[in-house]
Amino acid sequence: MEDCCMLPYYTAQSSPAMGMFNTSMGKLQRQLYKGEYTIFRYAPMFESDFIQISKRGEVIDVHNRARMVTMGIVRTSPCLTLPDVMLLARPAAVCDNARCGPATQKRESPPAEILELTRLLPLMFVKITIHNSVKKQLHLKLATGRSFYLQLCPPSDASEDLFVHWENLVYILRPPVEAYSDTRAILAGNTLDSSVLEEVQRSPVGYAMKFCEEKEQFRISRLHMNAEMFGSTYCDYTIEI
């Protein structure tokens, strides 16, 4: 039996995100299922590939290559009605032909299959907004105040508009008035106190963080990305292999 057929669906009856997690498995979820991150092995996940862009929508590249990011939204417990964790990963090795141009926004060929998990972020410390719905761009703001921008890079054989799911996610996690980046809504994570931190530590998210920290082969450090766009904090964990 295929591995993907063995994964259960966590379908809380009151969950507005139920349909999102009943999509087919992506490469990050398949990799986590087969790997040693047991905390995420059976967790339902919705994921897509993105390219990192600037606020003006320009592609951020390194050595003439677009910076690919796989973002996964995870529900760590079947008791939860909403997702609670964001995972960010990047290709461990980039294939020569794996590029995503700003004109087509389609991958010419699949990127390397092996992904490197780089971030585990509690969603309560991340604000996701729609930066540009026409260009399928998202704005992610961390509790530290750091921001970065991602543009959806769907597979060439995609049979549906995946950005619709991301738009739905934005509205599920935030009230409509805060859904777009041009509002002046205040990020709740900017006013963190000890009670919030204690709540996180007792939650499945806190267990996941502790699990990742205790694994000997991993160390917590800053993400190897644009220093002006990323920072390190207690709620912004980076896992290096």
Swiss-Prot record:
Organism whose genome encodes this protein: Homo sapiens
Gene that this polypeptide is encoded by: GARIN6
InterPro entries membership: GARIL-like_Rab2B-bd
PANTHER family: GOLGI-ASSOCIATED RAB2 INTERACTOR PROTEIN 6, PTHR22574
Protein name: Golgi-associated RAB2 interactor protein 6
A Pfam family annotated for this UniProt entry: GARIL_Rab2_bd
Family recorded in the similarity comment: Belongs to the GARIN family.
Disulfide pairings: none
